[in-house]
C-alpha cells in the first residue's frame, strides 16, 4: 500500500500524540484483541492474559515500539521491520489475519484516547499505514 505525503503527515501527527503512552496503548490494543478475537490468544499460551498483567504490558510496549519504528522509517517500513517480519514468518508463524485484527484494535484504542484527532482523513491514513505494516510483516511468508 502506497502512502501519500498527506497520509505520512497524518500518521506522524497522530503518533506524536502517543508520546509516553506507548506501553499503555500497546497493552490496551492487545487486551482488546484478545477479547474481541479470542483465537489470537493461542500465540500466547505462556502469558498471563488478565487485565494489567506485566506480560501484556511488556509485549504491548514492544508492539507500540515496532509501530513507532515503522513511523520513524515511514519511507522504508520494510527495512525497519525486516527482523520482525522474519521472526513472525519463520519462527512464530503467526496467521497473517492477526495483523489486521491488531491494526483494527490499535485504531480503536487511538479513537478512544484521541477522538478529536482521529478525523476521517487521519483514520483512513492510519488504516493504510497499518495495512502497510501488516503487508510488511507477512511479506516473508511466501
UniProtKB/Swiss-Prot annotation:
It comes from the Eukaryota. Red blood cells. This is Hemoglobin subunit alpha-A. Heme b binds at residue 88. Residues 2-142 form the Globin domain. This alpha chain is from the adult major tetrameric component, which has been called hemoglobin A or AII. Gene3D superfamilies: Globins (1.10.490.10). PANTHER family: HEMOGLOBIN FAMILY MEMBER (PTHR11442), HEMOGLOBIN SUBUNIT ALPHA (PTHR11442:SF48). PROSITE patterns: GLOBIN.
Amino acid at each position: 500500500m502506497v502512502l501519500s505525503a498527506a497520509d505520512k503527515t497524518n500518521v506522524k501527527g497522530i503518533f506524536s500524540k502517543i508520546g509516553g503512552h506507548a506501553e499503555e496503548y500497546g497493552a490496551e490494543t492487545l487486551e482488546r484483541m484478545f477479547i474481541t478475537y479470542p483465537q489470537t490468544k493461542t500465540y500466547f499460551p505462556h502469558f498471563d492474559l488478565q487485565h494489567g498483567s506485566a506480560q501484556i504490558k511488556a509485549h504491548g510496549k514492544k508492539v507500540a515500539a515496532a509501530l513507532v519504528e515503522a513511523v520513524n522509517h515511514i519511507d522504508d517500513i520494510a527495512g525497519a521491520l525486516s527482523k520482525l517480519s522474519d521472526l513472525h514468518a519463520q519462527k512464530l508463524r503467526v496467521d497473517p489475519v492477526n495483523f489486521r485484527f491488531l491494526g483494527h484494535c490499535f485504531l480503536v484504542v487511538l479513537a478512544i484516547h484521541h477522538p478529536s484527532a482521529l478525523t476521517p482523513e487521519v483514520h483512513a491514513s492510519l488504516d493504510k499505514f497499518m495495512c502497510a505494516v501488516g503487508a510488511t510483516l507477512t511479506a516473508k511468508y511466501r
